[in-house]
């Protein structure tokens, strides 16, 4: 069943929906048949997520201390997965076991083997290295696990030929690394080491070390091929090929980092392994390997200086390059967004690696050892033979540095010395700030640590290790005799060696309590002496089953509850775990013993004692008061463990002692749950016979009952036993609404279905996702169940939440008999799911001709029904290349050349999506490849437009297109090359130019016009095209074309960051930035002006282009004004300081040019900026003389033109600013004064537009003082605030009467124009402008300028009558006055009418609209 259903039916039952969606985007529009994925892949995708792995890993650590942990861990991990995972009835029906039991067991076995290989902690000379590397490796592997599915997707869908080859090679390396690593990790310690040390050339570690070299085919070289060839830089938002390459680059880089830390970890392990074995030469060799690998890979990853190309930096540069692409926000590729989430992790790894140093001492000790057997007066000689000290045997020594837990390599051995009649020589070494560890070796025997010199110590006697060795001699008398001799000759009973263990620990391990007594007599503190892991002599004796030594230590008042460091074991934990009954009995007889002490996982000695054959458990249950219901950290009680280990006798003892039968663990799993899951019928029977057992107990989150689990795990005998119990509730549901009938139907258990229905199970009940038992029975393997369910009243038209009916499933799965049954019971053949998918779509998509025939014969109109993606049955048959269904549809008059509303045939559609196999299928079956759509495009055109190189190459190479045929006024080849450049399809461009050696059009011009940087670089760098060249045929240079952009482009405004990037790139290749770049002799500057490219113009000037260089006698400013390029004009004047009155060869200014063409925004701007409105060009023509209608009206309305001349010099106002353009006569002309002072006087212009233009001009004529006063007035009106101009008072110069008169005139005129522009003709008689002028004049002369605002308020009564539009106009005027945007004016919410109250105006309903 799993091998055939189509994705669209199930949507992977919601869980895989997003994966399918993105998979389809990667492949194109084709549907995905489930037959394309293996069952294992489907099940993994649906069920086994990272949640499961995390659960398993945690359980392995928690359970590891239990004897028989492998029996317990898998069910507990499965229970955790059930509690957190994505189990669903539909998944179960597909026979994708919702709990991947075998995978869980496999992972657990690896975890336990890893623990079994773990070397004795704290013997580790490289312990800190191991911790550091393991932590980073774990981080990297987590990222790789998260990215693994995405990388598989890339492998399956990648199309680009160049990228595909590289990615496949990367995949080979990745797969070999993953597989061989798993192979090695699955082995026990000795085999593991042997595998790591295989001789060359098959040595795995050597192979991995080679991956950082630049040799062809290595991982490092492959990653740099992607980088150097820029395969990971997308050209547009739809460039999936580049996104795939980017993903492969990132995943490959993470693998490269993983390889680095894996190598360091394994060389560290090997070094430590040999250190503990005493193979010091091998330790040194692997120490060097570890160090060199770390340094080499670190250099490759992050470099050491600016001259290197470190991999991580290069990858981050690529990522940043991609992120900065302007189109990147339009990318719809899930892989890309997944990748962006991981970018931060790569940055963190880079920092971590950069700051990382191996915690080692990178210095090998210089051998400087003196060995002396000479007798000394203050030390007694020790005669040979003694232990290893035999006459004639050679002995030698070596040194190792240690400081703060860091270790060095070991020095070379000293020259061997032959032992004579004395043992235990004196050893002298050089002084050093670091500790010096001294090793000795007799002949070819294993070296051993004999002492440590600390600080200023330079000498010691090699006798202490001999005491340690003597304490563990198996013969008690001999051990005691030698130990006594050594102690008498100066051996230190407190000296420690490997693991921090001394002679007392050795005696405990061997059970030599006489030696123990001798040692304690010398130093009673040895009684509680702990080694580096916290093991005391009592721990060691208990774990070694040395009961006599245990009793000896207890007799000396040893602490029986002492705990180890990390595991928190007491001696009783160790004895119980190993089922050591005598030691256990000795310990529990002690009054002070803590029977319920919990280790780091929360297990008590009772927990650890329970195994399949434990006798200790019975002792602890019967003979002690141990708490029997105590829980571990994961909530396991002793009864849970007894159930999981199938220990019925202990279970009975626990139940008899009052164990809580219904206690759940952390996930709510009771002992009965575990018994049902594991199929332990005898245990289930025992538990069900207990008085208070809860057969309906549910887990915490998912609410699984024991019956659910028995059915789910197909433990049929257990399920039937549970069904026989009268207390069972068969209608209980999980939190997903799954009841036992759903599970029985899904798993194909007909007998259970029959029994459940006999007990009145509800056949119509739906799960929370809308699945009925009938749905699940159809999906399942047993085809008898649907017939039985239908007979019992199942609804044949039930819909899942996704709208899928049983008929959909039967059609998609090809179950014709069930399909006929459903039809006979009234199933709706036109039922649609949420994607408008009908059963006919499912049948076609999955290749079930028999069902297709049934449906079409029943209703021929089904031939034309479309789903939400506009796919109709014939389309799907073509897409899936099902020849039998295709032929059937053709026999029913389906037309392979039928067109849609856009004129596209199936060949067009599948060419667009790059489905080469489908295109081939269509052509083999009569598709006409010459047909054109409504845009006159063939399948070949669409393949080019969408970058489908595979279709293009097929069409060319199979002669499906005549490249020399006429097409749109040129040849097909011409348009093919130009269009591929236009649409930024670099691979297709390269195909034509490199493979076919064709270059009929000039593709660089197209690439430049559309600002495709990568294509431009390709033509300039690889093809050697000169970007500055132009001629009669190519009338503009590529550089010029880049600046200007496509004639119409994709938008009218092509001034984008992409285009500027291309300009920046090409500007370095241009010999003269001020040179001509087209046949009309334009410069780059003038081209930027014609194209209205402000940012490009700014860039060009910034790199040396001359903003004043004339073209055919016209300066750039004149050209910009002539073209109406307002922003260009403004930029030239304000940013690049071009003279506003610069003239062309006919002495015309920019104002002439703008006025002639009625470009009013430019005209107004130039006037405001002080352009000479009376400038005369050829024939004494002023701007007004050649102006268009609008410009002429505007210029006429300006009172600057009322006198025959303008200022000969500029006046300096009271703030030191120049007042431009004020007519001298305007300040002294009495006639004008009379005119302005007369009541109701209007502007000369009858045009409202003229009035507004005029007053816009005047605002530039008021000096700063006047502008500030008007601003004060406006602020009062609009914000209920008064601007304080006091700071400026001291700088106001005294005015002459003429000056004050002129200023008052200007301000009065300004106020008049403001009002007339706002409220229109006539201005009420109540406003006397001569009076206004008089008061302003007096205020100026008196120096009391602050009263002007109050005075203006008194004349503003008419403002209270403004309507909404007038208010908007007023705001606009205020913007002109102050450069403050009207939208920025804030009106206090609490005082909306305050502005009007200040001027004591009438308030009406319109006033609130000011907001």
UniProtKB/Swiss-Prot annotation:
Its main location: secreted. Gene3D superfamilies: Ankyrin repeat-containing domain. Residues 1-35, 1196-1411 form a propeptide. ANK repeats lie at residues 462-495, 499-528, 533-562, 567-597, 601-630, 634-663, 667-697, 702-732, 736-765, 769-798, 802-831, 835-864, 869-898, 902-931, 935-965, 968-999, 1000-1029, 1080-1109, 1112-1142, 1146-1175, 1331-1361. It comes from the Eukaryota. One of its GO terms (molecular function) is toxin activity. This is Alpha-latroinsectotoxin-Lt1a.
